């Protein structure tokens, strides 16, 4: 059986934590930030843990992650 390929787009956007959760950066930060409050801008600086139902799909595209 041939090796499975990792999706390059998923590899760039997501990472796997030591416990197996999927971590990504917050979305919706590219433009239009003047309308938002300082608190919402500050919160979006960090990372987000994906919902387990969505992370199952992402894990299919990353066959050799932990």
From Swiss-Prot:
UniProt entry keywords in alphabetical sequence: Ribonucleoprotein, Ribosomal protein
Region span, Disordered: 21-40
Protein name: Large ribosomal subunit protein bL35
PROSITE patterns: RIBOSOMAL_L35 (PS00936)
Gene: rpmI
InterPro entries assigned: Ribosomal_bL35, Ribosomal_bL35-like, Ribosomal_bL35_CS, Ribosomal_bL35_sf
Comp. bias intervals (Basic residues): 28-40
Homology family: Belongs to the bacterial ribosomal protein bL35 family.
Gene Ontology biological-process entries: translation
A single GO molecular function term of this UniProt record: structural constituent of ribosome
GO cellular component: cytosolic large ribosomal subunit
Species this chain originates from: Ehrlichia canis (strain Jake)
Alphabetical list of Pfam families matching this protein: Ribosomal_L35p
């Amino acid at each position: 059986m041939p090796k499975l390929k990792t999706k390059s787009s998923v590899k760039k956007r997501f990472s796997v934590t030591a416990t197996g959760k999927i971590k990504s950066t917050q979305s919706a930060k590219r433009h239009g930030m003047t309308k938002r409050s300082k608190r919402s801008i500050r919160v979006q600086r960090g990372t987000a843990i994906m919902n387990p139902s969505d992370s199952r799909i992402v894990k299919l595209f990353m066959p050799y992650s932990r």
